[in-house]
Amino acid sequence: MSPANVDYLKTNNPQINPSIIEENPNSVDISKIMHKNTDCVEIRKQHHIPLDTTVFVYGGNLGKPQGLGFLLKVIESNLNNSDVFFVLVGSGTEYAKISSWFEKNKPHNALLMQSLPKQEYNKLLKSCDIGMIFLDKRFSIPNFPSRLLSYLENKMPVIAATDSVSDVGYIAQENGFGFSVLNGDLESINRYIKKLSENKSENKRMGQK
């Protein structure tokens, strides 16, 4: 649970003794993780991802709860931006809709892939620069997507476009490893995309947080 989950549970369940409610964050042993190396070039070549662009990746469930219509708007607004490349990996109820959008618009700077085996997905992540998290803005109960952990394992800054009650983006921004926007705020998310794509040294610094 995150702090927002704890607050929600206490507020909406007064019958529960608050002293027994604790935050238990997800964690990973980073000493066992192989970080980015020269293989990234080969991985990008394998998937036809440009070597000289900043790669933003969304990996995970492609379903209605993620509010991914906004992600498509983000890609559409950056169709002429040769400095960025978007990678979407996953499966779910919205995959067909997203695939249809890709077929229609044929974005030159975006790639849609179905779910990969874990080892292949982890390799792909190592070749990316920025992790992206999306949640439908209509959520009224806090969510904390576990995909954040995969991004942090690979020392990537994150952009979280979520509802107003989830605190995953707030935590990323407060701790210096990401930015938080409301799902649907195209101006703000593009401002952060521009900032991260133009300052690779800042990306590295944020990824070390």
Describe each PLM feature range.
Residues I20, I49-F56, V84-F85, I130:
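Charged active-site motifs of nucleotide-sugar-dependent glycosyltransferases
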Residues H35-D39, K194-K209:
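Conserved donor-nucleotide binding/catalytic region of nucleotide-linked donor-dependent transferases
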Residues Q66, P117-K126, G131-L152, P157-Y170:
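Nucleotide-sugar-dependent
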Residues D83-G90, Y95-N122:
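Nucleotide-activated donor-binding/catalytic signature segment of Leloir-type glycosyltransferases, i.e.
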